[in-house]
Amino acid sequence: MREIVHIQAGQCGNQIGAKFWEVISDEHGVDPSGEYRGDSELQIERINVYFNEAAGGRYVPRAILVDLEPGTMDSVRAGPFGQIFRPDNFVFGQSGAGNNWAKGHYTEGAELVDAVLDVVRKRSEACDCLQGFQICHSLGGGTGAGMGTLLIAKIREEYPDRMMCTFSVVPSPKVSDTVVEPYNATLSVHQLVEHADEVFCIDNEALYDICFRTLKLTCPTYGDLNHLVSLVMSGCTSCLRFPGQLNADLRKLAVNLIPFPRLHFFLVGFAPLTSRGSQIYRALTVPELVSQMFDNKNMMAASDPRHGRYLTAAAMFRGRMSTKEVDEQMLNIQNKNSSYFVEWIPNNMKVSVCDIPPRGLKMAATFIGNSTCIQELFKRVGEQFSAMFRRKAFLHWYTGEGMDEMEFTEAESNMNDLVSEYQQYQEAGVDEGEEFEEEEDFGDEQ
C-alpha cells in the first residue's frame, strides 16, 4: 500500500540505516534471513510499507544502499542483518569522496548517480502506491552530503509529487569530525532548503548527551547513538505500519508541520528514555511521556527549544492509551508553556495515536517540532563557514572539482536568509501581518 523507498548514503547514512533496519525488522517479526517469525497478524498486515515480499515468503527491505567506497557496505553486509538486503540494491563506487562535498555532488558522485536512480526507479515501479522517499545521510561529509543532496534533487525532478524526507546528521557544536564540515553542511543545507519536504535534524553531540546523561551509558558507541535515531525513524512511520486510532503519514505530517515552504527543518525527540537499571522504578503514563517529550534534554539536535518558539509540533503516541487523556495532556502543556508557542497559529499540535508500542515498552511517543530555535544550529555552522571562507581556506579542494566560489557565496546567503526567516517568525505577533508583507517586498528589491 503506502510504500516508502529508503535510501542510505555515505558512511553515516549506512550505519544509521543498518540500525534502523534492525529495529524495523524486529518490530515486524522478521529475522535476519528475511523469514517471518512474528506472533501477531498485525505485524504482517502492512509490512509492505518498508518490505517487499520475495519468493518463498521472504521479506526484503525496500532499501537502497549507496556509498562511494565499499568499506561501510562490507561492514553492513557482515552485520547482524546484512544478509536481508537485496544484493543489487548495493550501489557503490571505489574512489571515495574524501569528505569533499564537490566530489560527492559533481564528480565522483555524479558518475554513480545514474546507477542509483536506476535502482530507485525499479524499486518505485514495484510499488502499488508509493508514498515517498526517506534518506539517511550526514551533512558534514562528502558522500552523504554531496551525493545525498544530488540524489534528492534528481529524485525530486523525477517524482515531484512524492514526499521527500531526510534524516540528516548535522554538525555538532563542539565535536567536529572533519575540518571542512562547515563548508559541506552549508552547501547541503542550500540544497535541502530547495529540494526536500521534511528534514529531521539530528546531531551526534545531542545524542551523546542523551546517552550519557539520561541513559547513563559511560562510553556510548555509535551503535548506541544510531539506535536512538532509529527509534525516531520508526516512530515517524508507525502509524503507516500499524493500526491506530488517529493516523498520520509523511504527507499529513508535512501539511501540519510546515507553515512556510522553506521552514521544514525539524527537531526530533523520543520518550521514554530511561537508563537500563531505572526502568522498573518508573511508571509509564501519558503525562510522564508528554513532559519528557517536551524536555529540552530529549531533543536529538543541539538547539534548545527554550531559546525559540514552536511554530508547530507533532506528537505520535504508541501503545494502548486513552485518546482523551492524550488530548488533555497536550492541551495542558500548550497552556502551561504558551509563551513557547507562536500565538498566530492556534492549536499548533498534531497528534496521532498508534495502538502497537515498540518492542519492550508499554507506551512510547515520538516528538517532531518545528521550532525557531533550529536557527541556532544554522547560525553556528554559518559562523564557522564565514570564518574559513573569508580566508578562502580549503577552497582549492572544491574549485579543483569544478566548483565556483559563487556557489559558496550563494549557499552562505541562502542559509543566512533561512536564519532570518526563522527569527522573523519568532518575533511575530498576531496583529503584525501587514508589516511583514511590506518587509518582504523590500527584501526582494535589494
Curated annotation (Swiss-Prot):
- GO molecular function annotation: GTP binding; GTPase activity; metal ion binding; structural constituent of cytoskeleton
| Subcellular localization(s) per the UniProt record | Cytoplasm, Cytoskeleton
Q: Which Pfam families match?
A: Tubulin (PF00091), Tubulin_C (PF03953)
Keyword set, alphabetical order: Cytoplasm, Cytoskeleton, GTP-binding, Magnesium, Metal-binding, Microtubule, Nucleotide-binding
Which InterPro entries does this entry report, sorted A to Z? Beta-tubulin_BS, Beta_tubulin, Tub_FtsZ_C, Tubulin, Tubulin/FtsZ-like_C, Tubulin/FtsZ_2-layer-sand-dom, Tubulin/FtsZ_GTPase_sf, Tubulin_C
User: What is the protein's quaternary organization?
Assistant: Dimer of alpha and beta chains. A typical microtubule is a hollow water-filled tube with an outer diameter of 25 nm and an inner diameter of 15 nM. Alpha-beta heterodimers associate head-to-tail to form protofilaments running lengthwise along the microtubule wall with the beta-tubulin subunit facing the microtubule plus end conferring a structural polarity. Microtubules usually have 13 protofilaments but different protofilament numbers can be found in some organisms and specialized cells.
Name what cofactor the protein needs.
Mg(2+)
Q: Which GO terms describe its biological process?
A: microtubule-based process
Ranges annotated as biased composition (Acidic residues) = 429-446
Question: What's the protein name?
Answer: Tubulin beta chain
Binding residues for GTP, per the UniProt record?
A: 11, 69, 138, 142-144, 204, 226
CDD domains, alphabetized: beta_tubulin (cd02187)
**Cellular component terms per the entry's GO annotation:** cytoplasm; microtubule
Q: Known PROSITE patterns for this protein?
A: TUBULIN (PS00227), TUBULIN_B_AUTOREG (PS00228)
Regarding protein family, the annotation reads: Belongs to the tubulin family.
Tell me which residues bind Mg(2+).
Answer: 69
Q: Which Gene3D superfamilies match?
A: Helix hairpin bin (1.10.287.600), Tubulin/FtsZ, C-terminal domain (3.30.1330.20), Tubulin/FtsZ, GTPase domain (3.40.50.1440)
Q: What is this protein's function?
A: Tubulin is the major constituent of microtubules, a cylinder consisting of laterally associated linear protofilaments composed of alpha- and beta-tubulin heterodimers. Microtubules grow by the addition of GTP-tubulin dimers to the microtubule end, where a stabilizing cap forms. Below the cap, tubulin dimers are in GDP-bound state, owing to GTPase activity of alpha-tubulin.
Location of region: Disordered: 427-446
